[in-house]
From Swiss-Prot:
GO terms for molecular function: methionyl-tRNA formyltransferase activity. It is an enzyme of class 2 (transferase). The keyword Iron-sulfur does not apply. It comes from Mycobacterium avium (strain 104). CDD domains: FMT_core_Met-tRNA-FMT_N (cd08646), Met_tRNA_FMT_C (cd08704). Pfam families: Formyl_trans_C, Formyl_trans_N. This is Methionyl-tRNA formyltransferase. It catalyses: L-methionyl-tRNA(fMet) + (6R)-10-formyltetrahydrofolate = N-formyl-L-methionyl-tRNA(fMet) + (6S)-5,6,7,8-tetrahydrofolate + H(+). Its EC number is 2.1.2.9. Disulfide bonds: none annotated.
Amino acid sequence: MPVRLVFAGTPEPALPALRRLLDSPRHEVIAVLTRPDAASGRRGKPEPSPVAREALDRGIPVLRPARPNSPEFVAELAQLAPDCCAVVAYGALLRDELLAVPPHGWINLHFSLLPAWRGAAPVQAAIAAGDTITGATTFRIEPALDSGPIYGVVTEAIRPTDTAGELLARLAVSGAELLSATLDGIADSTLTPRPQPAEGVSIAPKITVEQARVRWDLPAPVVERRIRAVTPNPGAWTVIGDLRIKLGPVRLGAASDLPAPPEPLPPGAIHVDRKSVWVGTASDPVRLDQIQPPGKKFMNAVDWARGARLDPAARAT
């Protein structure tokens, strides 16, 4: 008999896991729990989450409570009588009363090798820190943040040019298989969770738009990693003149196919030549590749600088 599941998730990275469970004969997804519709686009029209859209397309009931820990929703979930709840980036903390509803608990897929990088932004934190290995972990949710016992892990190398979006896309796919296998093992009574180690705990809080502003007073490798860590969301940015400019990943001098400026650049100083745009950091300059001026799409940095006619004294701040 298939395991009766409620799937809790919201953004696009949760879709591979949802699809894997929907297509499995061993799992019956009886409902999807997701965050309420959120304003999207220039008009701010409320739109369903990616998980809600997928569920609606598949004819799966969608639950969108504003207060998932309310007594009313706890009772509604209990009426569904799930055996287990699977969670991938749902986006809300779950309290004891809700956690107690399914007999096999709430099983979360988290995109780090716990106990490293507990929190909302584990992929971004791993890239920014310069980690070379990360992964995904399945664990049983407990009230404390990402602290429950572990069922399984899968590892993933972090490539030198990975953005958070690229790495998360790979982890979402490998993590979907891990979550499915974990749920199978729980149903078969062949998996026993192990406590998380007390050592190696690190926290990865959500990154704000303000924190995504580039700090040119840091060394070039740190600047480069931090930009990749917030690409595509919330997106790295800087101010040049009176313009707020979004930045795509940058190139270190050693990784560039074009020569660096002949003179050292202080942090934030800009050098423009015929083929490249460079910005100074606390160590070596970095080369801008793609930038996004206000109200426009991403474009080549050289083309933008040529059209903008930058003041020779212009700085990125």
